[in-house]
Amino acid sequence: MTPLKIAIAGANGRMGRVLVEAVNNHPDTVLSGALEHSGSEALGLDAGYAVGLKTGIAISDDVDTVLAQSDVLIDFTRPEPTLKHLQKCVEKQVNIIIGTTGFDDAGKAAIRAAAEKTGIVFAANFSVGVNLTFHILDTVALVLNEGYDIEIIEGHHRHKVDAPSGTALRMGEVIAGALGRDLKQCAVYGREGHTGPRDPSTIGFATVRAGDIVGDHTALFATDGERVEITHKASSRMTFAAGAVRAAVWVNGKTGLYDMQDVLGLNNR
């Protein structure tokens, strides 16, 4: 079997470094390119320098050259560069795995449009455990659909720039969908001052940013006399990276827009 050629965007970032390691660890993949922004101090360095690997792949800012020698790009950067990379992937017929969060509606529309021409796995979280949690939440919300207040609490490291996290928002979307609600209409993001009694139709969000928290997410269903808490805690970014590489192998040869539920076969259950 010919190894799948995978390039990493943001290869010198916290997530990018772990992705380089994950590609190296997978028996069916090989690192074909590593991208960083122009002016990065890492340009020219071996892509594995930060994790003790010698990959033979130099970090570059030449997107066209990197994509020309790749089957898939994995991108966990920020919305603006991800959308630029997306258009290049369409031009080069390269599949793309998108773990970037914080897209606005226009950005999401661009991803949907691009999926008509290439294969895309776009997910708020690539952890197997988190995606199983989404699946569980759908069932729980259907059962606890009356008389329960719903809150989502998430925590991440001090460097995360968007809030709530994409994973927290996806949890909210799953719950709202199960309840027949529109998250845009029922979400409450933070509370301050005299807020009055809680509206029972709302889904609340609370955010923590501190230290080096990799990712903590809890969905709370509370009523008089009891509460149900469904929690996922990540202790290593490798869980996200390994999932992204798994998605890259899965989407090879496909066209269309998928998420991690598709990769894991959970959308068929």
Curated annotation (Swiss-Prot):
One of its GO terms (molecular function) is NAD binding. It comes from the Bacteria. CDD domains: DHDPR_N (cd02274). One of its GO terms (biological process) is lysine biosynthetic process via diaminopimelate. It is an enzyme of class 1 (oxidoreductase). It is found in: Cytoplasm. The keyword Amino-acid biosynthesis applies. Its EC number is 1.17.1.8. This is 4-hydroxy-tetrahydrodipicolinate reductase. It comes from Neisseria meningitidis serogroup A / serotype 4A (strain DSM 15465 / Z2491). The gene is dapB.
